[in-house]
């Protein structure tokens, strides 16, 4: 078997195992990523609906403004599941058994990352459909949906890398749980909830360097149907930078773990 075929086989093996594990606990695997985003579009958009009366607010409804952020929030709540599973494999010795087969370490990581992307894309589509059902306007077409999914996949790969770095470094599931509230400062210091022009100056500065701002803005343009490919380019640059930072850290942490064992 060629190296490429072996790598593809190993990656597929890990992906199928991850899917099988998720089917045994579908609520945590597929339900958890959509709970808070659905709360955002179903409750928060109603509570803060009058914010559109503020002069300069650029959307016709708060739901229209918040829906793209809720769509991308699925990645922030979907991340950590596979990283927790990998830490469990380390603790139980299953990772050692995989290495004896042998399964490529890169395939182990890639298979789990692909599973994370699949889970989050499904969750994102559910939230997008729910947003439109609740009344969020969607002015785009099929290509705009594809653009939104690309942005979501990039954000998922970048954000989930944080969990792999912490999990593989600490080998502790409890340490991973500490990262869950990280979505709060990241989303608050962005354009997710209010336009940057209406925020205090220091928040505007923080939002301008926050990659979440750029992916949310891109998703917002795609959802409105007014997107240009430059919007996707900005999201790719922001998401790509985060991916390079976190996934490189995850790869180095995984390599150190394998050497230590």
Spans of features found by a protein language model:
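Short helix-capping/hinge motifs at transmembrane helix termini and TM-loop junctions
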Residues: 44-53, 77, 131-143, 167-172, ...
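Membrane-interfacial helix-loop-helix junctions in multi-pass membrane proteins
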Residues: 139, 190-244
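Alpha-helical transmembrane segments and their short interhelical loops
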Residues: 105-181, 227-251
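Aromatic- and glycine-rich beta-strand/loop motifs that create alpha-glucan
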Residues: 1-36
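Short cytosolic juxtamembrane segments of multi-pass membrane proteins
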Residues: 254-261
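Hydrophobic alpha-helical transmembrane segments of multi-pass membrane transport proteins
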Residues: 39-46, 62-134, 163, 179-182, ...
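Transmembrane helix segments
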Residues: 48-49, 167-209, 213
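Short, membrane-interfacial amphipathic segments enriched in basic
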Residues: 1-13, 159, 202-213
């Amino acid at each position: 078997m060629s190296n490429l075929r072996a790598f593809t086989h190993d990656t597929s093996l890990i992906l199928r195992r991850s899917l099988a594990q998720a089917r045994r606990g579908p609520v945590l695997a597929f339900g958890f990523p959509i709970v808070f985003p659905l709360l955002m579009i179903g409750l928060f958009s109603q509570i803060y609906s009058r914010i559109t009366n503020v002069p300069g607010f650029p959307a016709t409804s708060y739901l229209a403004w918040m829906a793209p952020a809720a769509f991308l929030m699925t990645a922030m709540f979907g991340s950590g599941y596979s990283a927790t599973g990998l830490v469990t494999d380390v603790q139980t010795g299953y990772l050692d058994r995989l290495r004896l087969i042998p399964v490529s370490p890169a395939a182990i990581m890639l298979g789990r990352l692909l599973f994370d992307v699949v889970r989050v894309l499904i969750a994102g589509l559910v939230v997008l459909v729910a947003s439109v059902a609740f009344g969020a306007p969607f002015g785009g077409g099929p290509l705009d949906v594809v653009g939104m999914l690309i942005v979501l996949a990039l954000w998922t790969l970048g954000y989930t890398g944080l969990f792999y770095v912490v999990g593989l470094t600490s080998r502790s599931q409890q340490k991973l749980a500490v990262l869950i509230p990280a979505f709060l400062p990241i989303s608050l210091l962005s354009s997710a909830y209010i336009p940057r022009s209406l925020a205090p100056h220091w928040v505007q500065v923080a939002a301008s360097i926050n990659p979440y701002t750029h992916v949310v803005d891109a998703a917002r343009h795609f959802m409105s149907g007014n997107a240009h490919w430059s919007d996707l380019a900005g999201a790719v640059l922001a998401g790509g930078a985060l991916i390079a930072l976190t996934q490189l850290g995850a790869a180095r942490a995984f390599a150190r773990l394998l050497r230590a064992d």
